[in-house]
Amino acid sequence: MAFPVDLLDNCTHEELENSSEDYLSSLRCGDPEHPECFSSLNITIPVSLSNVGFVPLYGGNQTQKILALFAPEDSLTAVALYLVGQWWAIDDIVKTSEPSREGLKQVSTLGERVVLYVLNRIIYRKQEMERNEIPFLCHSSTDYAKILWKKGEAVGFYSVKPTGSLCASFLTQNYQLPVLDTMFIRKKYRGKDLGLHMLEDFVDSFTEDALGLRYPLSSLMYTASKQYFEKYPGDHELLWEVEGVGHWHQRVPVTRALQREAIKATDVSQYEATRPVSGEYGLAAVPEHEPGLDDTQSSELQIHSLKDAFASTSEGPEKTPVSTRTRSSHLKRPKIGKHFQDSEFSSSQGEDENVAKTSPTASVNKIEYAARTSESSEEFLEEEPEQGVIDFEDESGDKDAQPALETQPRLQKQDGDKDSALEPVNGEVMDAALKPSLTTEDEDSTSEGLEEDLKVPPFNSSGEPGNPVPLVAESSKVPEATLAKTSPDTDSEMLIDQSPSDDKGHTEENLSPVSKKKTLLGSSDNVATVSNIEKSDGNFPNSVVPEFPEEPVSQNLSPNTTSSVEDQGEEGAPEAQEPSATQSSLIEVELEDAPFPQNAGQKSQSEEQSEASSEHLEQFTQSAEKAVDSSSEEIEVEVPVVDRRNLRRKAKGHKGPGKKKAKLT
């Protein structure tokens, strides 16, 4: 029986394609209810237009095609080819009836090209290719190839890219040496040294000094090369593993490639030996890792470190290494209007001063405690109004002297003098302070009045007088010295008190420290005296003055703003002695708006402001007398002694231009 390879010896591509076109035309005209069937290996496949088509014989070249029949379940695998006027099964196409076709025969006829196509494209790629192998491309019509025939059947092939042939990967480059491109042997014929036979035929077919094998080496090429070098050890420099077209930088000796593959095979065998068998997990290859206990310990340490890393990310913000400055509550600015319960104000005074330096509005909240204290003691307003005014007068004098005492070395000498009472001395001072005829004094008498007023001994908590010092002769000078310090405050506070009358009740409750000052200015004569003294005392250097510019206070300021004015005084003397809770708020009032050295224009301006503000004093005098007695019995003051000589010397050294002495009638 003749097979297609035998029948196609004298056939051309055109004749084969024309016969295929004629059959396809007859198939279109056939009866669809009674189709032709093809039987192979006990399988019957109906032939119809839906499962037949042309396939290229040389891969990318679409000019030479053959008609193929596909299985219904696999439309990409041909089960038969239409050759010589009939359908031929794949197994029949690779057979021959010619006894002369034995061994390796070079492909030359159309039938042999069809056999090469079937071996490469159908048998190898669809049936026998391994997973780790790379499929071969379809051979062209001019490729050098040989088919291995064995007992009337094609069992394998190999193909070569001769020197000078065009490289498919590099379209403009040609091969520099003959390269063994493909090699294939069917599985049922492997193990009979057929690969070695093909390699020996390749070496004998080309006479070049260097021959190449396609990179990467297939398993068949690797086995054949190994057998070849065992049989011919002198040809180590003949065979090269070639990549690309085979330049010198693209070739490696096959012996080195064999060593590389041997190392890979050893690693794979060790892995296979150590890999647990199915059903016996955890029992394989444990003793091999026991000698190196350090490896297991290091792996455990890595696991623990990973656990710690994951735990640190889930424990919370307290262990997070990021800065929490913006989250800390003590660094946030308190909002205006928020009330702090400063029951222990003296213990937290240092912290409040630091916050007040960076945020002046934060001091508003600290004075509200004193305001609420004055509200709680409203019941004492009608009982001792005059005595409350006297208390505030001595307190203001005390507070004027206190910042100056920070630079005096005699501060420790006053610890034992705390036995005098406040009431009898203040009564005498009040009698003199309320006299309507106050005369202006020169700058020397003003400083003398201040110094002699500071000699009042401190009072103890029991309220009993120790060694009272009579101040009757100097009663007219005490309010002058006191008002000289507080005249800038008084001017600004007169503007505060010009708020609408509906807020008057609220002002009387919350601004008791301010009202205490207003009672000292009983008439316009007092204001004139204050303005003159203010000019002389404007350059007084011994008082600790915070660097805040004087600004006019608006008439609509709230009581909280007045409290902030009082609070800023505390910032000017952060190193002063720590007062009690009720005294600290009053100290802040005296130090806040102490003026800078004034020129002539500024002094005249302040004098005009004091004269304008005196018009509003009388209408608030009665309300102030009711509010001045807030916490009069609760306030305990210390009046430390200031060095008189230093105060007088500094006061005289900073005198302004001379003023005419005038009596105000």
Swiss-Prot record:
Q: Where is the composition biased (Basic and acidic residues)?
A: 412-421
Which cell locations does it reside in? Nucleus envelope; Nucleus inner membrane
Q: According to the UniProt entry, which residue ranges have a biased composition of type Basic residues?
A: 327-338, 646-665
Q: How does it sit in the membrane?
A: Peripheral membrane protein
According to the UniProt entry, which residues carry Phosphoserine?
Answer: 348, 377, 447, 512, 610, 613, 630
Bias category Acidic residues: which stretches? 376-397, 440-451
Q: Which InterPro entries match?
A: FAM169
GO cellular component entries: nuclear inner membrane
Identify the keywords attached in UniProt to this record, alphabetized.
Membrane, Nucleus, Phosphoprotein
Say which domain of life the source belongs to.
Answer: Eukaryota
Composition bias, Polar residues: 311-326, 521-533, 553-566
* Region described as Disordered: 309-665
> What PANTHER family has UniProt attached to this entry?
PTHR22442, SOLUBLE LAMIN-ASSOCIATED PROTEIN OF 75 KDA
The family classification in the record reads:
Belongs to the FAM169 family.
Q: What name has this protein been given in UniProt?
A: Soluble lamin-associated protein of 75 kDa
Query: What is the species listed in this Swiss-Prot or TrEMBL entry?
Result: Mus musculus
